[in-house]
A protein has these predicted regions:
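Vicinal oxygen chelate
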Residues: 2-17, 35-36, 43-57, 61-120
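Amphipathic alpha-helical segments
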Residues: 18-33, 84-87
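A generic "binding-loop/recognition-motif" signal
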Residues: 18-19, 34, 40, 77-78, ...
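Short alpha-helical
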Residues: 21, 51, 80
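Generic, ordered loop/turn and secondary-structure boundary motif
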Residues: 26, 57-60
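Short connector loops at helix/strand junctions that flank enzyme active sites
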Residues: 39, 49-51, 64-68
Length: 120
C-alpha cells in the first residue's frame, strides 16, 4: 500500500463575529495584510515564508469556552507586544512560568486566547 501524501498546514481559520475588526487586530499584531476576501471570509498573507496563513470566517455565534487550539507568538520584546495587544483592544489574561520558561496568555478583542513568549 502506498504511503499517503504528507499534509502541511495551509491556513489557520479563526471564527469571528467582527470580520473587519479581527482582520485589523491580527494584521497589526502579525504585520500581515489581507490577501483574499469573499463574503464572510478573509485570508491574510502568510505569517512567515512557507508558513501558514491566518484566515477568518464570520460566524453569528459568540465564543463560549476556552479555545481548543491557540497561537503561540514569540518576539524579542514580549512586553512591547503585549502593550500593543492592549492598545488594539486585546487583553493580558495571566502569566506563567515553568522551569524558567515564561509566557503570557492574552486574548484578542473577541476573547480568543493566544500566548506571547520571548524569542529564543
Amino acid at each position: 500500500m502506498a504511503r499517503p501524501a504528507v499534509a502541511r498546514v495551509a491556513s489557520i481559520m479563526l471564527d469571528c463575529n467582527d470580520l473587519d475588526g479581527m482582520v485589523s487586530f491580527w494584521g497589526a499584531i502579525l504585520e500581515v495584510k489581507e490577501k483574499n476576501r469573499f463574503p464572510g471570509y478573509v485570508w491574510m498573507t502568510r505569517i512567515s515564508r512557507g508558513g501558514p496563513a491566518l484566515a477568518f470566517q464570520q460566524v453569528s455565534e459568540k465564543k463560549a469556552t476556552k479555545n481548543r487550539l491557540h497561537l503561540d507568538l514569540s518576539t524579542a520584546d514580549p512586553d512591547a507586544l503585549i502593550t500593543h495587544v492592549e492598545e488594539l483592544g486585546g487583553e493580558r489574561l495571566h502569566d506563567h512560568d515553568i522551569a524558567g520558561f515564561h509566557w503570557t496568555v492574552c486574548a484578542d478583542p473577541e476573547g480568543n486566547e493566544f500566548c506571547v513568549t520571548k524569542s529564543e
